[in-house]
């Protein structure tokens, strides 16, 4: 989804090769609050935003998890001295920034623990830096938007929506990442996969920003 929120990595189009090191705020994700809304996956967003979903699927953010698999993103791995044959999908420090909702309710389950059957089925749906990586877990605000065509941003925030700002991007795109390249957020946000057009809704299930 090339939206105003496209994924956690929105501040930097990364070739997706290597382990982006999560900041303290990202690592805190493995300790969710009891009332924290669940992640529902980008396919849920697709129901109303199918054009944006199709656009997002073509981005490197969508393929971020694939880049962690053996013999992927070889040029970048070579550049930063990462083992080209290693499976980085088993490294929590890498996975946290290459999936959606790592360790959070409804998100990608934690690496290194035994997964339940439900988590095994859920994990593939949360691979890659998806819509909710930048927009927040959609369990509550997604249905609210469908039922309330006139809504305010503040209402969505109370339901778990997140503004895709520089701080959000830098939770993963920071100097703890072996592939990090300094960037100007203001310049980057308007280019390529980080472009922030208004969302367009493809049928009568919703309207952009409460508009008609």
Language model: regions and residue ranges:
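Sequence context of c-type cytochrome heme-c attachment sites
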Residues: 19-128, 132, 138-163, 182-212
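A contiguous, mid-protein "functional segment" used to position or interact
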Residues: 162-184
């Amino acid at each position: 989804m090339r939206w105003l929120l496209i994924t956690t990595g929105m501040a930097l189009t990364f070739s997706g090769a290597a382990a982006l090191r999560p900041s303290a705020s990202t690592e805190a994700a493995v300790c969710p609050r009891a009332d924290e809304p669940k992640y529902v996956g980008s396919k849920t967003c697709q129901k109303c935003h199918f054009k944006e979903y199709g656009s997002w699927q073509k981005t490197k953010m969508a393929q971020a998890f694939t880049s962690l698999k053996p013999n992927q993103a070889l040029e970048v791995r070579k550049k930063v001295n990462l083992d080209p044959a290693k499976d980085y999908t088993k490294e929590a420090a890498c996975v946290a920034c290459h999936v959606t909702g790592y360790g959070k309710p409804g998100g990608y389950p934690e690496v290194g623990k035994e997964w339940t059957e439900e988590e095994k089925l859920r994990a593939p749906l949360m691979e890659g830096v998806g819509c909710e990586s930048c927009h927040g877990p959609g369990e509550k605000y997604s249905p609210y938007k469908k039922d309330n065509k006139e809504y305010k941003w503040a209402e969505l925030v109370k339901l778990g929506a997140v503004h895709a700002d520089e701080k959000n991007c830098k939770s993963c795109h920071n100097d703890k990442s072996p592939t990090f390249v300094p960037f100007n957020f203001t310049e980057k946000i308007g280019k390529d996969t980080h472009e922030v057009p208004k969302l367009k809704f493809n049928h009568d299930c919703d309207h952009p920003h409460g508009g008609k």
